Regions:
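Proline-centered turn/helix-capping motifs that create local helix->coil transitions or kinks
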Residues: 84-94, 166-174, 209-215
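N-terminal core-binding DNA-recognition domain of tyrosine site-specific recombinases/integrases
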Residues: 3, 8, 15-83, 89, ...
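Hydrophobic recognition helices of helix-based DNA-binding modules
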Residues: 37-42, 77-85, 207-211, 262, ...
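Basic, Lys/Arg- and aromatic-enriched nucleic-acid-binding interface segment
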Residues: 71, 86, 90-91, 96-144, ...
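Conserved tyrosine-mediated DNA breakage-rejoining catalytic core shared by Y-recombinases
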Residues: 150-209
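DNA/chromatin major-groove-contacting recognition/catalytic segments
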Residues: 56, 122, 174-177, 286, ...
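Short, basic (Lys/Arg/His-rich) helix/loop patches that form interaction surfaces
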Residues: 121-130, 140, 197, 212-219, ...
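Short functional hotspots where side chains directly engage DNA or cofactors
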Residues: 159-164, 220, 261, 273-291, ...
Length: 308
């Protein structure tokens, strides 16, 4: 049996192994979790005890991290533990962590129908390529990185679809203790995120006259060979909301607004899930489908009618 190593030493070997299988952006996220959360507490330990992990969890929650963020940190910790045990670098350890009951569920923030119409009308009357990106997001539910990565070649006027082929993001690179950021273009979040989305009539009206004049290799938001990055575009979007006197809403709220309007229009959940590029339908159901009392009553009434 090899000599037991510290969590820090195992993490280095684990990262090297992971490098072969995951995207650079995922590896970067793992590195940040290690540097900011795991290694400062567990780096010098040669064994993980359930009590230590439970205490760590509660401390992170008290620091203001959400349960989802803490769970993501624990997933990385568990992967390192499994890797270490498999290669006889750490002792076998099973631990289960309990989370306090959440008092209230986070409600997704979306645009009101009036404000959504206001933005879409403004874009039609005040065309810029950056404004077009907001309209595209409200019409397709694309993520900000996907919008930034959209090229004119991804827009097909014959099939009237947009192909989501790439995403742009700025990632942290940690190299020998030194940190720097890098803007990267990569494939979208998951295999399901590579998708084709139909364009509605209004979006086609905006895009059709432009598409024929544009260089296919150019990015839509800049109409240049160089893209804009999500942070810059997010700042522009915030200014747009301010200008239109619309309450502050995260850019992701545009995607949520699109999905919510689809569900409100009684689109079937599987189709909405595919359009959004979710890994599975349960993500869509958990995020957007929340039947109210009236819906529940109708469901039960419908069931009893079928018995007659």
């Amino acid at each position: 049996m090899e000599e037991l190593k510290t969590i820090r030493e195992v993490a280095i070997l684990w990262k090297k192994d992971k490098q072969q299988y995951v995207k650079l952006s995922t590896l970067s996220a793992y590195a940040l979790i290690l540097e900011n959360h795991i290694l400062p507490i567990f780096g010098d330990k040669r064994q993980l005890h359930e009590k230590d992990v439970q205490d760590f969890t509660l401390i992170k929650l008290q620091e203001g991290l959400s349960q989802k963020t803490v769970k993501d940190i624990l997933i990385v910790l568990k992967m390192i533990q499994k890797f270490g045990s498999k290669h006889n670098l750490l002792p076998m350890a099973e631990w289960s962590v309990k989370f306090p009951t959440e008092q209230k569920k986070n409600v997704l923030e979306v645009l009101s129908i009036a404000n959504q119409k206001k933005i879409m009308q403004y874009v039609k009357e005040n065309f810029t390529f950056r404004n077009l990106g907001v309209y595209v997001c409200l019409s397709t539910g694309m993520r900000i990185g996907e919008i930034c990565g959209l090229k004119w070649s991804d827009i097909n006027l014959i099939t009237e679809t947009i192909s989501v082929n790439r995403t742009i993001e700025r990632i942290y690179i940690i190299d020998g203790g030194k940190r720097h950021t890098e803007l990267i273009t990569s494939t979208p979040k998951t295999q399901n995120s590579l998708r084709e989305i139909p364009m509605n009539r209004e979006l086609l009206k905006l895009i059709k006259p432009l598409k024929k004049l544009m260089n296919n290799d150019y990015f839509v938001l800049t109409n240049e060979a160089k893209p804009t990055e999500p942070r810059t575009y997010r700042n522009y979007y915030k200014q747009l909301l301010k200008q239109l006197h619309i309450p502050d809403l995260k850019f992701q709220g545009l995607r949520h607004s699109f999905a919510t309007r689809c569900i409100e229009s009684q689109c079937d959940y599987k189709t909405v899930s595919v359009i959004l590029g979710h890994a599975n339908i349960s993500t869509t159901l958990n995020l957007y489908v929340h039947p109210n009392m009236e819906h529940k009553k109708k469901c039960i009434d419908k069931m009893f009618k079928s018995l007659k």
